[in-house]
Swiss-Prot record:
Record keyword Nucleus present: yes
Highest taxon above the source species: Eukaryota
Record-annotated site: Important for substrate specificity: 212, 267
GO CC, any one term: nucleus
E.C. number: 2.4.2.28
Organism: Saccharomyces cerevisiae (strain ATCC 204508 / S288c) (Baker's yeast)
Tagged with keyword tRNA processing: no
Location(s), subcellular: Cytoplasm; Nucleus
Protein name: S-methyl-5'-thioadenosine phosphorylase
Length: 337
């Protein structure tokens, strides 16, 4: 089937447009952001949050963010807990996966002093036990992109850096999310929704925008893939280079193309899956935010062991860097160089 990557309804998208064009919100924010969220438009309208600022698309040394950045504060006893939202594909879904300004998006969140990044993405399932409407917390990635996307801050002439990527996601972040596994529901069916998580759960990232052939889909299964999308690379790599704990929540919409005798998929089924996924994404995001606002988890305080790692990863000596290169580095790490 032709998987629809935007996991939220047009109505919610229009609602977001109103939020993101609200001239009454300040266009500057001088506080500290605790959590960055990258994903679909419906996540901007959570009951536990109140928008307090709407930053125009942020200009970074690596381009401009894919959308304005909405800053919201927690509605409750800890109103100092702030969340920054970026729509990965733009307000009107105008950026295809290959053209998303991934470096600008992640750099903006880093510049806002985010402590962690939570990402949402629609995926196709490569395994029979991961059903449409199920959610997955992957811990590994197979990169099948084509080298078209800018995937590093440290790959330009005059700057060399190598970061470890053996564990591309934050296991502590995933475990934190997994405590809410019983919160997602499937009210329209007797079939329950599941949140899948283990250390070998793997997401395949393909270039797109076309979807897999049947042969490719079967190959990805042989590789050990569990789900497939077009967004996790280079997002996860850039989060690592920014020393940010990062976890993607994958939302299954279909079985990709590997099933030889798949039943025809109807428009009603697709819309139902997308609607249910959007509802559960809101539920899960709300639970995570409410819990974090009550007590920020340790992995966010400590950076999950990533803090300071970039100092050891840059091979180029500062005295050999150009002024422009140093300015770019200081945008991400103002206290390192």
């Amino acid at each position: 089937m032709n998987r629809i990557k935007n996991t939220f309804s047009v109505a919610k998208r229009l609602k977001l447009s109103k939020v993101m064009t609200n001239s009454e919100l300040p266009s500057i924010f001088e506080g500290t952001v605790d959590l960055g969220i990258i994903g679909g438009t419906g996540l901007y309208n959570l009951d536990c949050l109140e928008p307090i600022a709407l930053l125009p698309p942020m200009v970074t040394p690596w381009g401009t963010t894919s959308s304005p950045v909405t800053i919201s504060q927690f509605v409750g006893t800890n109103s100092h807990f702030h969340v920054a939202f970026i729509a990965r594909h733009g307000i009107n879904h105008e950026y295809p996966p290959t053209k998303v300004p991934f470096r600008a998006n992640m750099a903006a969140l880093k510049n806002l002093n985010c402590k962690a990044v939570l990402s949402f993405s629609a995926v196709g399932s490569l395994q029979p036990h991961i059903k449409p409407r199920d959610f997955v917390l992957p811990q590994q990635i197979i990169d099948r992109t084509k080298g078209i996307r800018h995937s590093s801050y440290f790959n330009d002439e005059g700057l060399v850096g190598h970061v470890g990527f053996g564990q591309p996601f934050s296991q502590k972040f995933a475990e934190y999310i997994y405590q809410f596994k019983n919160e997602i529901t499937n009210p329209e069916s007797e079939e329950p929704c599941h949140l899948h998580y283990d250390k070998d759960m793997t997401v395949v990232c393909m270039e797109g925008p076309q979807f897999s052939t049947r042969a490719e889909s079967k190959m990805y299964r042989m590789f050990g893939g569990h789900v497939i999308n077009m967004s996790v690379i280079p997002e996860a790599k850039l989060a690592r280079e920014c020393e940010l704990p990062y976890q993607m929540i994958c939302m299954s919409t279909d079985y990709d193309a590997w099933r030889d005798e798949a039943e025809p998929v109807t428009v009603e089924t697709v819309i139902g899956n997308l609607t249910n996924n959007g509802r559960n994404a809101n539920i899960l995001a709300s639970k995570i935010i409410v819990s974090m606002a009550k007590e920020i988890p340790e992995f966010m305080h400590t950076g999950d062991g990533l803090r300071g790692s970039i100092k050891k990863s840059i091979s180029t000596k500062p005295e050999a860097m150009s002024k422009e290169t140093l300015e770019r580095l200081r945008y991400l790490f103002p206290n390192y160089w």
